[in-house]
């Protein structure tokens, strides 16, 4: 019988972690393992890139409320999740005032801690050999999934951001392995959680050459390129560049 692997992520919109997950899924041998992918909300440009060998689990409506507008989920009757998210923002505001740090991602852990208790269990899916929480926060895989081994991924260099270590430590500590994507990420993580060194394991992102070439050859909207037409030789016209990223030190913004 093939080993059963469960992988969880919020959505598959364009992002580094999401692209990394697609690379990992493409690298797995589906003749040797069964992979169930649980995407909380079936949205994002990378949904179409999920390999055919992956079993995409159906959406569970209540899990979609974690990232949708609060006003919208209140209209649908999810008062418990809405209240949890509002309470999480209040807790985070108090934490930021105490720590005097503006670049904090502590809010994500507060939201997870305040909403996960209201989410339905996923144990009806049976016991997995391995459950992977691919993106923070990791409470859902910790609390709602039954597995012999549980691994959590860390994609962010914690030396650039502020987190509430008191709140996060019990979550990270519950996992059998913590997978870091680089040496610098490992170093930053251990600067916050030195007691978890024995659980940390390095596994760099998997991105195949074929995937990069396929993405490079995809058609795109050339509106941006047309904006530069006629600029050759015009030294008085500045070059305009556009970059996209989360407004935080960890993304160099």
What are these regions (language model features)?
Residues 10-14, 33-103:
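N-terminal strand-loop element at the rim of the active site
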Residues 9-22, 251:
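A short, glycine/small-residue-rich beta-strand->loop->alpha-helix junction that serves as a flexible
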Residues 8-9, 181, 203, 241-245:
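Short hydrophobic "strand-cap" motifs at the C-terminus of beta-strands
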Residues 130-158:
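Active-site proximal beta-strand in glycosyltransferases
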Residues 91-96, 112, 132-138:
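Short His-centered aromatic/hydrophobic patch
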Residues 151-155, 159, 173-191, 195-224:
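Donor nucleotide-sugar binding/catalytic pocket of nucleotide-sugar-dependent glycosyltransferases
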Residues 110-119, 155-174:
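Nucleotide-sugar donor phosphate/pyrophosphate-binding loop at the beta->alpha transition
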Residues 6, 223-251:
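Conserved donor-binding/catalytic core segment of Leloir-type glycosyltransferases
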């Amino acid at each position: 019988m093939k080993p059963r692997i469960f992988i969880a992520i919020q959505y598959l919109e364009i992002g580094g972690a999401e692209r990394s997950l697609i690379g990992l899924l493409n690298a797995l041998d589906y003749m040797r393992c069964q992979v169930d992918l649980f995407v909380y909300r079936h949205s994002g440009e990378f949904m179409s890139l999920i390999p055919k060998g992956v079993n995409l689990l159906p959406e569970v409506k209540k899990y979609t409320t974690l990232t949708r507008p609060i006003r919208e989920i209140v209209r649908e009757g999810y008062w418990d999740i809405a209240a949890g998210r509002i309470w999480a923002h209040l807790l985070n505001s108090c934490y930021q005032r105490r720590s005097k740090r503006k670049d904090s991602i502590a809010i994500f852990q507060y939201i997870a801690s305040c909403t996960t208790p209201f989410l339905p269990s996923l144990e009806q899916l049976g016991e997995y050999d391995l459950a992977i929480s691919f993106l923070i926060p990791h409470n859902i895989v910790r609390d709602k999934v039954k597995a012999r081994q549980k691994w959590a991924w860390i994609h962010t260099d914690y030396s650039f951001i502020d987190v509430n270590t008191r709140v996060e430590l019990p979550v990270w500590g519950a996992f059998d392995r913590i997978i870091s994507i680089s040496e610098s990420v490992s170093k930053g993580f251990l600067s916050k959680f030195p007691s978890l060194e024995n659980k940390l394991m390095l596994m760099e992102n998997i991105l195949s050459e074929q995937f990069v070439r396929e993405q490079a050859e995809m058609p795109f909207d050339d509106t941006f390129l047309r904006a530069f037409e006629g600029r050759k030789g015009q030294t008085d016209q500045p070059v305009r560049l556009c970059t996209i990223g989360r407004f935080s030190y960890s993304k160099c913004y």
